[in-house]
């Protein structure tokens, strides 16, 4: 169904609010490097309806307020043999990359999510944690609708709309975010992201 500007703005406002409220919780995921840059956050996360209303349109009802800004960031993921990985509380169930319509690349995560869940005989009702790349609020909302996800489980500590979209690092950031949430709380979680050309990738993790 159609996703209007009000829905997009509300999702973006929520992403900023959740990120702001989760700063202390998310601090454990950050490894400080020898720089002062990480101490200076240029974004207040104080997005509201008034700011959204003043935001310039990019295309249609997509605006600068409900679009992730370009950002610099990095995330570290280590690849190991199967045995060391099984010693950790968070277990890799599987991951897939699937192809979709190259003219609708933002919807590609839907097929990837469905595929990886089918492979493991799971459905969305079994998920307790969901991380989706929100390059645009409309894209995140469309993927939530298309994959039948519970929006209350998606990006519960904010997403790229609040933190920015560091292209080439965004997927690893989702994986790190999901890993830490599952390690802290247990459950089954999925992270999904789109890429240019209609590529969708999804990662499925579990923690007892």
Model-derived features with residue positions:
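Active-site pocket-lining segment
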Residues: 93, 99-162
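Cysteine-centered functional microenvironments
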Residues: 1-2, 10-11, 60-69, 128-130, ...
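Structured core elements
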Residues: 77-78, 131, 190, 204
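Conserved active-site and cofactor/substrate-binding residues in soluble primary-metabolism enzymes
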Residues: 3-14, 43, 47-50, 65, ...
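Internal helix-turn-beta structural module
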Residues: 141-146, 150-155, 160-205
